Amino acid sequence: MAEKPTAKPKAAEAKDQSDSYAIVEASGQQFLLQPNRYYDLDRLQAAVDDTVTLEKVLLIKDGKNDATVGQPYVKGASVELKVMDHRRGPKIIVYKMRPKKKTRRKNGHRQELTRVMVQSISIDGKALS
């Protein structure tokens, strides 16, 4: 009987890397950010291809270690984002009317968004991803 190798398959290694994430506070909301993924945040005052650093990191989870929870923020932690595009969200229609009256009001709104790609998640200058 031949022994099976004990090395991890490549899929498992990729899964370990994708298990790392950070929960950050941006635009008045909390986002779960994973490396090499893109997200839409409220409009940031940065040009396309600029790098933005978020310092308000609430939690960091490495693929192999336990989570590091901040009180309220993790000290020395940061997330680097690259601005990919400025775009607008879907149109939201707000329609108000009063029954049995001739009062009707229709408004439309499109939120200004910035699409960002997560470059790296780091703690104390050491990149997790």
From Swiss-Prot:
- What SUPFAM superfamilies does the annotation carry? L21p-like (SSF141091)
Q: Which family does it belong to?
A: Belongs to the bacterial ribosomal protein bL21 family.
Report the GO molecular function annotations. rRNA binding; structural constituent of ribosome
Q: Which gene encodes it?
A: rplU
Q: Give the UniProt record's GO annotations in the biological process aspect.
A: translation
**Subunit structure of this chain's protein:** Part of the 50S ribosomal subunit. Contacts protein L20.
Q: What is the lineage of its organism?
A: Bacteria, Bacillati, Cyanobacteriota, Cyanophyceae, Synechococcales
Q: Which residues form a coiled coil?
A: none
Q: Keywords assigned by UniProt?
A: Ribonucleoprotein, Ribosomal protein, RNA-binding, rRNA-binding
* Cysteine pairs bridged by disulfides in the record: none
Output the superkingdom of the source species: Bacteria
What species is this protein from?
Prochlorococcus marinus (strain MIT 9313)
State the GO CC annotations: cytoplasm; ribonucleoprotein complex; ribosome
What is any Pfam family matched here? Ribosomal_L21p
**What protein is this chain from?**
Large ribosomal subunit protein bL21
- Function of the protein: This protein binds to 23S rRNA in the presence of protein L20.
